[in-house]
Amino acid sequence: MKVTGKMAEKRKQSRQRKKQNVQSDIVDTEKKNLRNKETNVIAFFFVGLFVAAIVYLCVFNIKDAGTIVNNPYNKRVDNQESKVVRGDILADDGDVLATTLTDDEGNESRYYPYGNLFCHSVGFTSLTGMKTGIEQSQNYYLLSETNNVLDQIGNDLSGGKAKGHNVTTTLNVELTQAAYKALGSNKGAVIAMEPSTGKILTMVSNPSFDSNDVNTDYEEWITYDSADSVLLNRATQGLYPPGSTFKIITALAYIRQNENDYYNYSYDCDGQAYIPGGTTIACFDHTAHGYQDLRKAFANSCNSAFSTIGAGLNKTSFINLWSTFLFNSNLPVGFEYSKSAMAVTQDSSISEMQETGIGQGRTMMTPLHNMMIAASIANDGVMMTPYIVDSVSDSEGRMVVKNKPSAVGTVMSAEEAEYLTECMRQVVTSGTGYAMKNSSYEAAGKTGSAQYDDSENYHSWFTGFAPYDNPQIAVCVILEGGYSGVASAQYVAKTVFDTYFGY
């Protein structure tokens, strides 16, 4: 068949139209794909925002809710307190330490059955919303509602109030009563815990106050100067020179620096020591202890020996050691505390190293921290995290939170802990810790007399644990200005040990 020019032209145009249509389809497809891609990006963006919002709400409600509710500046707490009767705070055996009373007119007031006894540990909550201690740290749980949704609606309609959760502490009433009585009128503190778990068994500070009087007497309490402050929890916030209790750290530093021959240590004490370029450090009453090995020098609390040891310590190693023991660091605890301070640097003078070696100079510690160190020795070198809240339960008795022991970390080897235990046991059997020498529970510890001014005034310390071969309790005592033949603090500690072991 003969193809004319017109037919050829038509075929050509048809092919061109098809080609254009194909190209148009390709362009349309590309545009459609681009639009789909843009739509997907936008969709993914909004899905991402939604997921982020869900995550934020979960974190807010699960992780941060307690912190936010516990914040004293959170005004929504006032609204929560209008709907919830604050839960109880209980001792380790369920004894009530804090509860809410309601009078005939429906007015609520917080009641503390033991008055002064737990004023620093349990704390208080005032009519103005001010809170301290466990009342503050556990505010979230104490105001958490137990009721289900229907009960909450019923309460809203009737004007009734839900019951908050109850907080059970690790605190023992009998032990706390004994510690408080042993302190008497002395300023100071007692704190004790289980070395293997970190459970705080007692926490007492003096001067104290009756938590029931917060609404009438608080304005007076805040006028006291720092030395007489009743609001300061000396067990966790009081900073003191550690005195001879710091010889625990000095001894460990020497052991590590002389790991192959520290057991051959020998020092002839004539009552004082002078280091060229340093200063003269004297033993108590300039007592000449004669020849001593490291254990005996520790038991005698020989300043001459330990100031000499301090002067010879490698500064880098020493700094690393006390950093391991959390000096100048935050402590992993859920209550208010002060950081213990250590000032040794590479530029420290010989005199400062001497003073630091015996726990003087610019070293400052809290009883809490001193107890943690003793407890780590008792626990084969593992430092446990101290905690004061055992569990939280709703008003029906259902467990909401159960705290478990956790370790800060290993601060020394088991062998080092064993040697230091031997040193601390010798303090009791033949050294300065004679108050517990004949006690059947066989304690180990370290006494301390810490000079705090230029007038030969001293604080009295004791830190230790019992039994030395199977430790169940670690105790630390500080008596401000309580130095009396280094006996005062150890006698308070003895009372706590006696009570714990049933004597």
Where are these regions (language model features)?
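Beta-lactam-recognizing serine transpeptidase/beta-lactamase-like catalytic domain environment
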Residues: 21-26, 93, 196-244, 249-481
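Periplasmic/cell-envelope proteins involved in peptidoglycan metabolism and beta-lactam response
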Residues: 1-219, 230, 239, 265, ...
